[in-house]
Amino acid sequence: MTNPISGTNVREILAQTVFGAVGNEAMEDLVRVARIEHFKLPTLLSAAGESPTHLRLVISGHVELVTRHISGSEIVVGHIAAGGWVTWLAVFMTQAPTHDFCISASSSCLALPVKDVQSFCVQYPEIYPMVIRMIGHRMRLLIEWTGQSVLASPVQRMAKLLSVLAQEQNRQTDQNGVTLYVTQARLAS
C-alpha cells in the first residue's frame, strides 16, 4: 500500500522492522491502519501524563524526550533518531510516560495506533522476543552507564555517557558514523 499523501510505501517500511518477521500477509492489518506523518514545525506528539495513542517509527528527523526541572524549565533528556521507535512502552504499559515526546521540524514518521499494535502482538506472539531485545538493548546501556558512574570520575562519566548515546543512536540508524544530538543542558541533566 502506498500512503496517498506522501507516496511512501508503508509496507516496505514495515517490512524492514520487527513486523517484517511475520511476513507480508500478517502485516496487512497494520498496513491498513498505518499513516505517514510529516511535521514542518517542531510538534508535541504526546504530553507528559498522557498515554501515547500511536507507536511511531521515526523516518527522518528526530524525537526529543523532554522533562521538566523542579524550577519548571524544560530539559531534553534523550533523542530518538531515524529508525527508532516512539515508544514501545505505550503498547505494553498502562501508566503514562512522565515526559513529553516532541518531534523536530522537517521530520517524518510512520504512525500505528497503539490498540492495533496490541492486537497484532496478541495475534503474533513471536514478535515479543524481538521487541524485548530492542527495549533490552537500551536498558542494558542505561544500567551499564549508571553502574559505572558510581565508580568513575566526572570526566569518565561524561565520556561513558557520550559513548552510550552514540551506541544507541548508531544502532537506530545502522550507520558507521553518527551525528550525536547533544546539548550542554542535556549533558548537565
Stretches with model-predicted labels:
Residues 165-189:
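Phosphate-/nucleic-acid-contacting segments
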Residues 1-168:
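Cytosolic regulatory regions built on CNB/CRP/Popeye-like sensor folds
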